[in-house]
Amino acid sequence: MIKVSAPGKILWIGSYSVVFGGISHVIAVNKRVSCSLREIKEKDSLIFHTSYGHFKNSGNELINSVLDTFRERLSQLPQGYEIDLYNDKEFIIDGKKTGLGSSSAATVSLTACLYYAIHGKLDLFEIHKLAQIANYKRQKGIGSGFDIASAVFGSIVYKRFTDLDKMDFYFEKLNLGNYDMMLGFTGKSSETVGLVRKFVEKSNLDDFKEIMRLIDEENYMAIKLIKLNKLDEAVEHIKLGRKYLNYIAERIVGVKLVSKMEEELIKIAEEEGALVALSPGAGGGDSIFALGNDLNRVREAWSKRGIFIIDVKEDEGLRLESN
């Protein structure tokens, strides 16, 4: 039996700006999607058991995007296998996604499993390219691919590709280390693709481009300081970049990324010892991320307000569990 797993993610530097070619840092976390594959007697079949249902020979949109990519790019698809594709429980709470990147982790995990069945090894760059193609087509070109890259390579500095076939992305491994990290799930899911599309619609405006340039400058400086182990100083640049982002969202795009309740949760977290708290990824309401040396007081304060706490730790990228 082959078994692989891929991590969830937290995009805390580069939200939205990464879509337009800006630099980002994404943290791979220890909530994972596992995929296992074993041979069956039906040699012309693929049977899927997943967190979202059971399928034969084709599946949901995610599964089909991966299968189609294998047919198009490799001209072959392994047959005669039963496949289990399951999320850790924290990806979905009460039927709602928590923003940890279950779709990207599942795409990478399934891609890796099928690739291993064909080649008997894991080639991270080939798996990354196949998973990016499947994800890109499924999202109809919206998105930057940071989540797929992190699910393969772990915690990384990332700049998106400009060409899907060339896959001319930039990445650099950058682990944060042993900080206390958590997500506070607010109980509602955001619609990431819809939010990103609204930003794309305004992206040709001069004001939009100028403020995105300022955001990217702050993000570059934050990442430079993180590399020097100066997280306290980096946080100030992250916060300023966030102020610019909220300005674009509200004044130019016409959306509010952080609700009053989320603003209150961020304020509480920073008063109770978090080095930084923010709405990760595309924002829009699903979770608030907090990072610090000791977040116990934050956990207590958020829990009192009915927020579901998801403790996370930095984790590695795509992993072969057994073969």
From Swiss-Prot:
State which pathway it belongs to. Isoprenoid biosynthesis; isopentenyl diphosphate biosynthesis via mevalonate pathway; isopentenyl diphosphate from (R)-mevalonate: step 2/3
Q: In the UniProt record, does the keyword Protein biosynthesis occur?
A: no
SUPFAM superfamilies attached to this UniProt entry: GHMP Kinase, C-terminal domain, Ribosomal protein S5 domain 2-like
Q: Which InterPro entries match?
A: GHMP_kinase (IPR053661), GHMP_kinase_C_dom (IPR013750), GHMP_kinase_C_sf (IPR036554), GHMP_kinase_N_dom (IPR006204), Phosphomevalonate_kinase (IPR035102), Ribosomal_Su5_D2-typ_SF (IPR020568), Ribsml_uS5_D2-typ_fold_subgr (IPR014721)
GO MF terms listed in the record are: ATP binding; phosphomevalonate kinase activity
The record's Gene Ontology biological-process terms are: farnesyl diphosphate biosynthetic process, mevalonate pathway; isopentenyl diphosphate biosynthetic process, mevalonate pathway
Q: Which UniProt keywords apply?
A: ATP-binding, Isoprene biosynthesis, Kinase, Lipid biosynthesis, Lipid metabolism, Magnesium, Nucleotide-binding, Transferase
Lipid biosynthesis among the record's keywords? yes
Query: What EC designation does it have?
Result: 2.7.4.2
Query: Looking at the record's lineage, which domain of life comes first?
Result: Archaea
Requisite cofactors:
Mg(2+)
Q: Supply the Pfam families for this chain.
A: GHMP_kinases_C (PF08544), GHMP_kinases_N (PF00288)
Which reaction equation describes what this protein catalyses? Answer: (R)-5-phosphomevalonate + ATP = (R)-5-diphosphomevalonate + ADP
The top EC class is transferase
Q: Which family does it belong to?
A: Belongs to the GHMP kinase family.
Q: How does it assemble?
A: Homodimer.
Tell me, what does this protein do in biology? Catalyzes the phosphorylation of (R)-mevalonate 5-phosphate (MVAP) to (R)-mevalonate 5-diphosphate (MVAPP). Functions in the mevalonate (MVA) pathway leading to isopentenyl diphosphate (IPP), a key precursor for the biosynthesis of isoprenoid compounds such as archaeal membrane lipids.
Q: What is this protein called?
A: Phosphomevalonate kinase
